């Protein structure tokens, strides 16, 4: 596994110089960098969770599986502190480039946690159309006291593509989160 090259003159393989330069865990011995070979374990770990999710909910589409995985991924605190301590757009771009969407929490993927609930819907939305969803949010969510509250929304879709254009995506999605008296009142405001 990993990157190798076949040297024809000597009839052997070569790995030196083909790896990725990374920090060395044994930097105390005076070698701060080392060459690492192979591939990340992130892809097979996420694929394993995705396969378990597909087995548990076989009616899910691949887009719903992607959305559930993405919504339960988080950046490790140490990564956020070192790559985005200023909490700005450039730091978030750095995090995305270096560690993607973060680690997927397998526990939250399969069952709601004490302080976290996952609601999902799968639907087809026509072009230039809207779809409204009503989220039942308990009164405790709005309760008094200083604490962080969050509603996370994840959208996943397979866009129509235009292969003859540089901007190949034909579809764009957006959402608006609205607190209203009823679904009917919100629908009237958007139509």
Predicted regions and their residues:
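Extracellular S/T/G-rich loop segment that most often corresponds to the catalytic His/Ser-adjacent loop
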Residues: 1-39, 43
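Structural signal for hydrophobic packing residues in well-ordered secondary-structure cores
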Residues: 1-8, 54-57, 73-77
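Core alpha/beta structural scaffold of self-assembling particle/tube/pore-forming proteins
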Residues: 61, 85-87, 140-141
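Short, small-residue alpha-helix embedded
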Residues: 42-56
């Amino acid at each position: 596994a990993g990157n190798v090259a076949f040297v024809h003159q000597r009839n052997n393989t070569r790995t030196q110089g083909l790896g990725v330069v990374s920090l060395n865990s044994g930097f105390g011995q005076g070698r701060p960098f080392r060459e690492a070979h192979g591939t990340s374990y992130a892809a097979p770990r996420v694929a394993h969770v995705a396969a378990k999710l597909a087995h548990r909910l076989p009616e899910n589409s691949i887009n719903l599986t992607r959305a559930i995985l993405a919504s339960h991924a988080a950046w490790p605190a140490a990564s956020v502190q070192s790559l985005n301590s200023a909490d700005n757009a450039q730091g978030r771009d750095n995090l995305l480039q270096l560690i993607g969407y973060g680690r997927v929490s397998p526990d939250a993927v399969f069952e709601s946690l004490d302080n976290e609930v996952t609601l999902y819907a799968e639907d087809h939305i026509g072009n230039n159309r809207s779809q409204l969803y009503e989220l039942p949010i308990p009164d405790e969510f709005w309760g008094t006291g200083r604490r962080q509250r969050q509603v996370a929304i994840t959208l996943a879709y397979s866009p129509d593509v235009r292969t003859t254009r540089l901007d190949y995506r034909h579809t764009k999605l957006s959402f608006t989160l609205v607190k209203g008296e009823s679904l009917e009142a919100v629908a009237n405001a958007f139509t």
